[in-house]
């Protein structure tokens, strides 16, 4: 398979088999579908019957969406090296489509870090058991006026109370009310079922008063903008969340930055 010298002489037979399978999938499935989607409009790329979903279903059936998740939760339990090799091959096939599957698991993989078993059972286990791509995630971090400023904890503005996030979570009794907007370039937003959402909880602390939640996107009050037309990487659908006004019973996973 490889056309280069393999400098890692310690790969096991399992490692090599996983890499070979991922390479074949990238060549035979990902590349042709990536070319097809690149020629489609943004709206058609995420419409019912799009080859995007055929690709996702095949990727899910091979377990690539859960490669890094431990077996105890239903994942493949791949080692870090195996996970790296799988993604290297998939991204070789097509950057956009590989990112689709990678981001599909982002909220669920990150949720494992919370250690909350109730939430893991509610969100992670069903995702791992899914083999038809009917459950997928995205990461709603960027905002129209801020980009991904909420990640820049080392910058002076991070603690500036004048810097207001565009998606706010306000505590009312035992519930949080989410109100605001995310950017028009949230990858996988047009079709994701859940989002890992970065938002602002305490505006008096600036971006430092932020947190994270896992948001089911079928809740009343969640609106999505139109799919984004792009010059390049058209095989990675992007879109917008706007006007989120949702009485959310709990903010499942929050922490002060």
Spans of features found by a protein language model:
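Amphipathic, small/basic residue-rich leader segments at the start of a protein or domain
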Residues: 1-101, 122-130
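Core alpha/beta catalytic barrel or barrel-like domain that forms the active/cofactor pocket
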Residues: 34, 97-104, 136-143
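Short Ser/Thr-interspersed hydrophobic loop/turn segments at strand-loop and sheet-helix junctions
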Residues: 63, 86-91, 215-219, 243-247
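N-terminal glycine-rich flavin-associated loop
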Residues: 98-120, 150
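A gly/ser-rich beta-alpha-beta helix-loop segment of oxidoreductase catalytic cores
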Residues: 135-170
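Short Gly/Pro-enriched turn/cap motifs at secondary-structure boundaries
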Residues: 156-160, 186-187, 203-204, 229-235
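A short core secondary-structure module
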Residues: 175, 179-223
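Flexible, small-/acidic-enriched active-site or ligand-binding loops
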Residues: 218-252
């Amino acid at each position: 398979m490889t056309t280069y010298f393999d400098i890692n002489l310690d790969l096991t037979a399992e490692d090599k088999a996983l890499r070979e399978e991922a390479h074949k999938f990238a060549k035979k499935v990902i590349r042709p579908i990536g070319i097809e989607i690149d020629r489609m409009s943004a709206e058609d790329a995420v419409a019912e019957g799009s080859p995007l979903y055929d690709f996702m279903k095949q990727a899910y059936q091979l377990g690539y969406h859960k490669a890094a998740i431990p077996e105890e939760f239903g994942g493949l339990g791949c080692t870090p090296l195996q996970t790296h090799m799988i993604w290297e091959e998939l991204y070789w096939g097509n950057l956009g489509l590989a990112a689709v599957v990678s981001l599909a698991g982002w909220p669920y993989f990150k949720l494992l870090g919370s250690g909350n078993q109730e939430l893991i059972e509610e969100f992670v286990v069903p995702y791992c058991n899914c083999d038809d791509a009917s459950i997928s995630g995205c990461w709603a971090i960027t905002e129209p006026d801020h980009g991904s400023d909420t990640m820049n904890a080392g910058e002076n503005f991070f603690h500036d109370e004048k810097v207001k996030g565009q998606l706010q979570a306000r505590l009312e009794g035992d519930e949080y009310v989410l109100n605001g907007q995310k950017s028009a370039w949230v990858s996988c937003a047009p079709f994701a079922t859940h989002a890992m959402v970065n938002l602002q909880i305490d505006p008096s602390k600036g971006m430092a008063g932020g947190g994270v939640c896992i948001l089911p996107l079928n809740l009343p009050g969640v609106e999505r903008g139109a799919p984004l037309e792009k010059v390049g990487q058209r095989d990675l659908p992007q879109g917008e969340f706007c006007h989120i006004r949702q009485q959310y019973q709990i903010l499942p996973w929050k922490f002060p930055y």
